[in-house]
Regions:
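Glycine-rich beta-solenoid repeat tracts in large extracellular/virion proteins
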Residues: 1-4, 24-30, 48-53, 74-81, ...
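Flexible coil/linker segments and helix-coil junctions enriched in charged and small residues
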Residues: 73, 77-78, 131, 415, ...
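Beta-strand-rich solenoid/repeat architectures in extracellular/passenger domains
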Residues: 8-23, 38-46, 58-72, 85-99, ...
């Protein structure tokens, strides 16, 4: 049937129109009006069911049925012309079987509407349900309030191109079933697709909505998009296009993203909108090739390797809403290949799976967090930067899984933490911040770890980790160090506060050639047992303190150098616990207290400085002080050396606390500075068990206590004095050699107590005095030199005694004394 020039045509009820030739349309209204309530069937190529032209109208009523069977044979067509906008509506049924045979087509400003009762079904490849294309006096328009179903390959539910507009209304339902059969497509600048109803796709690579080449796609508040096939994204914007979701998007297939932007496009998940993905590798939102993705709503991914948001190849992703991922290796946000990911102040990221990183920057990318990141799985770091990337945190990061770091920089990357109370980890081995392989980590906020073996900050393999001004590090687990550097060129440094509360949790650690530096203004404090303030272990490792170090637990030394390492103190060291040395060098290591350095210990058996083992050395140019019984100033053990240099002062303030002790074969104690002891039996210097003690010309040894000997050689040891020895106290001898030991004096010895000999040799020992005006005693019974029990005393210098019964030289029990000097 054909009506023209304002005419009318009707196909009623049981009537049937059937055509068989090519281009043989069922009904045509050319600037006219046509209705069908019967049946229309076409068989030829390019044979439409109903066609309106030049402002005409065609209507397929509720009882109307249109069937086309060949290629390009559309069911309903509205073809505008000039300023004339043609119209076509469907309230009945339209079925097409041929390839590229659309259910309804609006072209050159035409309009087609599938009404609430209308049903459109297409079966051929590229047989789109409804199409609006080309501009006329107005954009071409296709709307659906009914049902649209396509079965063919690449057969879209609704398709807008070249400036057309397609709308799936609130009551509209779109279903596609084949590969590449997208629900709605908007192609070209000015083309728009909107959905307020339901869009469902079942095929592989079948997107819910697709905007490309400048098109725009909108899933509105009531809109529901659901896809079931692999690679079937909910919404896609490509080639400078735009897609926005204000409703709901659900995908079930593998590699099926909620929303994807690529090739310079922009996608938005707006406030109150939801995205849910169920398949593996199905990200919530993704931006690729210079595109941008923004989330203001909520994103949920349920399977493994399914990121909340991903930005790739120069793209950006910003989260202002909520991201939740449930699967293994399902990152909250990913920025890859010079891309950017940002989580704003209102943004929240929660991941549950193992290795599910909160935010991950990779390949020269950057990630910023101003909001909240929480991870629960093992190895699920809060933020990670890798391969020349950067991650920055101004917000809050919390991890609960084991080996789940707060922030992690790898392979020449950078991480920065600026927020107060900002990083907290709860699992074992979950470090606060870690930099590895020539990377950098900076903290000016808060880092807290609770698990065992969970360090505050770590630098590995040539990396740098710095706790800056404002930074506070606190660890609570066993073996959880405040800061740790491992490997040559690795460095940790502190300018503010480091606290550890667990057992064997050191403040700062340098291993295997690394460095640990506590700078001016830095404070390091440990509170539990065996928790050193600073530790350097391994050849080339170096620990330096320029600030303050405080330890409170038993066996918690201030600074320790082990295995050919070095520890230097230029600041303040304080230890409170028992058996807590100020500084310890062991296994061939070196520990030095510099001129500005102060070492103070308060616990029992807490020596100021200790060197243990061959080639180990402790040296002092500053001040060393001990305050409890049995706490020596400086100790050399098992072949080690202890040296108090010209500017060094050593002071002990309790009983049985020697100024310096050398113990064991080959051990050596050297004094060139000042040693002062206050306490009974607190000798100035002691050499025991084949050891040696030397007080050089610049050295001064002062003791104040009963039986507090100036220098004491015991058990085949030797003691030499070239400097000054002064003792105050009864039986406080100037020098004593006992059990086959030797003591020699070239300097000055003065004693001020009763029974305080200048020099004393006991049990097959030897004493020699060579100095002019070298021995003077002031107490009763304070002999100048005494040799007892097969011992020998020789004087070629000067001996003066001032007390009663104070002999110049005295030999008893098979001993001998000889003098060629003055007595």
């Amino acid at each position: 049937m054909y009506a023209m020039n304002g005419s009318f045509i009707y196909n009623y009820g049981a009537d049937t129109i059937e055509t068989g030739g090519a281009g043989s349309h069922g009904m045509v209204a050319d600037n006219s009006y046509g209705e069908n309530s019967g049946s229309i069937i076409t068989h030829g190529v390019g044979s439409y069911g109903m066609l309106s032209l030049a402002g005409g109208q065609v209507h397929n009523l509720a009882s109307g049925d249109i069937v086309t069977g060949n290629t390009y044979s559309h069911g309903l067509v509205a073809w505008g012309e000039g300023t004339e906008a043609s119209l076509g509506t469907n309230a009945g049924t339209i079925t097409t079987h041929g390839s590229e045979a659309y259910g309804a087509l609006a072209i050159v400003g035409g309009e087609v509407h599938n009404l609430v009762s209308g049903t459109i079904e297409t079966g051929g490849a590229y047989g789109h349900g409804m199409v609006a294309r080309d501009l006329g006096s107005a954009p071409s328009l296709a709307t659906n309030a009914g049902s649209v179903t396509t079965h063919g390959y690449g057969a879209y539910g609704m398709y807008a191109l070249d400036g057309g507009i397609v709308q799936n209304l609130a009551s509209g339902d779109i279903v596609t079933g084949n590969t590449g059969a997208h629900g709605m497509v908007a192609k070209g600048t000015g083309s728009i697709g909107t959905n307020s109803g339901n869009v469902t796709t079942h095929g592989t690579g079948a997107y819910g909505m697709y905007a490309l080449m400048g098109g725009q796609a909108f899933n509105l508040e009531t809109g529901m998009i659901e896809t079931g096939g692999a690679g079937s994204h909910g919404m896609v914007a490509s080639d400078d296009s735009y897609a926005e979701n204000a409703g709901s998007v659900v995908t079930h297939g593998g590699s099926a993203y909620g929303i994807l932007a690529q090739d310079g496009s922009f996608v938005l998940n707006s406030a109150d909108a939801t995205i849910t993905t169920g398949g593996e590798w199905s990200h919530g939102m993704a931006a690729n090739l210079g595109s941008m993705a923004v989330n203001d709503g909520s994103i949920l991914t349920l399977n493994s390797n399914s990121y909340g948001m991903a930005a790739v190849s120069g793209s950006g992703a910003v989260n202002n809403g909520s991201i939740v991922t449930m699967g293994e290796s399902s990152f909250g946000m990913l920025a890859w290949m010079t891309s950017y990911a940002g989580n704003s102040e209102t943004g929240t990221i929660n991941t549950s799976g193992d290795n599910a990183i909160g935010m991950y920057a990779l390949g020269g990318s950057s990630a910023d967090n101003y909001g909240y990141i929480t991870t629960s799985g093992a190895g699920a770091h809060g933020m990670m930067a890798e391969d020349g990337s950067t991650a920055r945190n101004w917000g809050d990061i919390t991890t609960y899984g084991s080996a789940a770091f707060g922030m992690y920089a790898l392979n020449s990357s950078f991480i920065f933490n600026y927020g107060a109370e900002s990083i907290e980890t709860w699992g074992d081995g979950s470090h606060g911040m870690i930099a590895s392989d020539d990377s950098y980590a900076d903290n000016s906020g808060s880092v807290i770890t609770h698990g065992d073996g969970a360090h505050g900050m770590v630098a590995l393999s040539g990396s740098r980790s710095r706790n800056l001004v404002g930074g506070v590090i606190s660890t609570y687990g066993t073996g959880s160090h405040g800061m740790l550097a491992d490997g040559e060129e690795s460095l940790v440094s502190n300018r503010d506060e480091v606290y550890t509360y667990g057992t064997a949790s050191h403040g700062m650690v340098a291993l295997n050639g690394a460095r640990a530096v506590n700078l001016e203004g830095g404070w390091v404090q440990t509170t539990s047992g065996d928790s050193y303030g600073m530790l350097a272990d391994g050849g080339g490792s170096h620990a330096v303190n320029r600030g303050g170090v405080y330890t409170g637990g038993t066996g918690s030394h201030g600074m320790v150098a082990s295995g050919d390492a070095t520890a230097d103190n230029l600041g303040t060291l304080n230890t409170l616990g028992n058996d807590a040395f100020g500084m310890l060098a062991q296994g061939g290591a070196l520990a030095r207290n510099m001129e500005t350095g102060s070492v103070i210990t308060f616990g029992t058996g807490s020596h100021g400085m200790v060197a243990d083992g061959l080639d180990s050395l402790v040296s002092n140019r500053g001040h060393v002080g001990t305050n409890s019984a049995g706490s020596h100033g400086m100790v050399a053990l098992n072949g080690a050396r202890a040296v108090n240099l010209e500017t060094g002062t050593v002071q002990t303030n309790n009983d049985d606390s020697y100024g310096m002790l050398a113990l064991g074969t080959g051990s050596l104690a050297v004094n060139r500075g000042t040693i002062t002891t206050y306490g009974n039996d607190s000798h100035g210097m002691v050499a025991s068990d084949d050891a040696r003690a030397i007080n050089f010309e610049t050295g001064t040894v002062l003791t104040s206590g009963d039986e507090a000997i100036g220098i004491y050689a015991f058990n085949a040891s030797s003691a030499d004095n070239y400097g000054i020895i002064v003792t105050w106290g009864s039986s406080a001898h100037g020098m004593k050699a006992e059990n086959e030991s030797t003591a020699r004096n070239w300097g000055e010895i003065t004693t001020y107590g009763s029974g305080a000999f200048g020099m004393y040799a006991l049990n097959s020992s030897f004493i020699y005095n060579y100095g002019n005006e070298s021995i003077e005693t002031w107490g009763d019974g304070s002999h100048g030199m005494v040799a007892e029990n097969s011992s020998l005393g020789v004087n070629t210098g000067s001996i003066t005694t001032n007390g009663d019964d104070a002999f110049g030289m005295y030999a008893l029990v098979d001993s001998g004394v000889f003098s060629s000097g003055e007595i």
